[in-house]
Regions:
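AAA+/P-loop NTPase substrate/partner-engagement loops
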Residues: 46-78
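A short helix-turn-beta junction within AAA+ P-loop NTPase domains corresponding to the substrate/partner-engaging
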Residues: 126-143
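C-terminal alpha-helical "lid" subdomain
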Residues: 156-163, 170-228
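Conserved catalytic/switch belt of AAA+ P-loop NTPases
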Residues: 91-130
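Pre-Walker A (pre-P-loop) alpha-helix and adjacent loop at the N terminus of AAA/AAA+ ATPase modules
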Residues: 1-24
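Walker A/P-loop
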Residues: 23-56, 135
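Conserved alpha-helical scaffold flanking the Walker A/P-loop in AAA+ ATPase domains
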Residues: 65-105
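An amphipathic alpha-helix signature
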Residues: 6, 146-154, 169-173
Length: 228
């Protein structure tokens, strides 16, 4: 993942020398709820730092909402900025052709980022190969292992003032294992929902007891029963 991000930053820097959007554009793909949009929102400031841009115009739009719009007008408003197209596989032929044409012109190096799930993105690349050639770097968000998801859980809960005890950790491992399927692997979004539910359950229980479940560092402890 780190290598992919480094490659993107290098590629974007090369593309910035040209005032068009013919190169230096990015594809971001991954499974459902794997944090694609969140990654993009962090990637854009990183690109701005790489290009020494203090601030830049950014627009997020779903492909189905972009269809039928005046792409040239949108690109003019976003000149030198970022156009993020979500669910990119829904782009119509007409919109894809117009976008391709606009990206050949002077966009002041506007960067276009396409986002979709892997299957959808592969369909788009196959359907619009001419447009796809302009996307010279790609971030493929990997499927996370159980250990990686649990490590995320540790960080996420601590950021929210909670800590998972040993039995709670075993319960979380078990919960992830039960829900981890080959055709639909567990993702960060699903684990986050599990943790939000556990934290809400623990927080609700605090008002029913005179003594709070707080450790020496001030973290509220999540127990096995909070994950049931």
């Amino acid at each position: 993942m780190k290598e992919q991000l480094v490659d993107v930053l290098c590629d974007v820097q090369k593309g910035a020398a040209d005032k068009t959007s013919q190169t230096g554009n990015v594809i971001v793909m991954g499974g459902r709820e794997t944090g694609k949009t969140r990654l993009i929102s962090s990637l854009i400031p990183a690109i701005c730092r790489e290009l020494n841009i203090e601030a830049s115009k950014v627009a997020y739009i779903f492909a189905e909402d972009l269809n039928g719009k005046n792409i040239a007008e949108i690109a003019s408003k976003l000149a030198g900025g970022f156009l993020v197209i979500e669910n990119a596989n829904q782009l119509s032929q007409e919109t894809a052709d117009e976008l391709d044409e606009v990206m050949n012109g002077n966009t002041k190096s506007m960067i276009v980022i396409l986002e979709d799930e892997k299957i959808g993105m592969r369909k788009l690349i196959a359907r619009y190969p001419k447009l796809a050639k302009k996307f010279t770097s790609m971030i493929n968000i990997p499927v996370f292992t159980n250990d990686e998801l649990v490590n995320f859980a540790k960080v996420y809960t601590m950021e929210n003032g909670f800590r998972i005890d040993q039995m709670g950790m075993l319960a979380l491992y078990n919960l992830i294992g039960i829900n981890q399927k080959e055709d639909q692997p567990m993702c960060i979004g699903t684990v986050k929902t599990m943790l939000d539910n556990a934290m809400a359950k623990a927080q609700g229980g605090l008002f029913k007891r005179s003594k709070k479940r707080v450790d020496r560092d001030g973290f509220t402890v999540l127990l096995e029963k909070d994950f049931s």
